[in-house]
């Protein structure tokens, strides 16, 4: 599921790096044939070089028709795979819409994304 892991298919999981073990765990979940996939912060603890690989796979799964519910704090990653975004603060929905809806909302981008904030 991840080319980087295929290169290490003969290794035992305990010999993989922490990020590779996280990718292995994520890969096991991604291999299910579910209609809905819930993924909680898949890039957490991954080296930057591994993050792109993970999000490429998530995007491929989403484009295959699987509904992906993704919890992620890094909006740059969300932009890559999301059709819709829900911002939640303290359990309450702050904004729901397309990625463009969120990015075009000046108050939301200033508060949550740190964009357009006057210093």
Predicted features along the sequence, with ranges:
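Conserved ABC ATPase signature
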Residues: 12-16
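Hydrophobic anchor residue at the start of the ABC signature
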Residues: 26
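Helical segment within the ABC ATPase nucleotide-binding domain
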Residues: 52-64
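A short, surface-exposed alpha-helical micro-motif characterized by mixed small hydrophobic
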Residues: 78-80
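ABC ATPase "signature
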Residues: 96-97
């Amino acid at each position: 599921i991840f080319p980087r892991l295929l290169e290490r298919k003969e290794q035992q999981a305990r010999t993989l790096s922490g990020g590779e073990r996280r990718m292995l765990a994520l890969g096991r979940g991604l291999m299910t044939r579910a209609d809905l996939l819930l993924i909680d912060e898949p890039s957490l603890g991954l080296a930057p070089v591994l993050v792109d690989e993970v999000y490429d796979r998530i995007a491929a799964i989403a484009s295959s028709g699987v509904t992906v519910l993704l919890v992620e704090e890094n909006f740059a990653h969300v932009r890559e795979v999301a059709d819709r975004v829900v911002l939640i603060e303290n359990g309450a929905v702050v904004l729901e819409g397309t990625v463009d809806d969120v990015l075009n909302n000046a108050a939301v981008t200033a508060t949550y994304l740190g964009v357009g904030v006057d210093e």
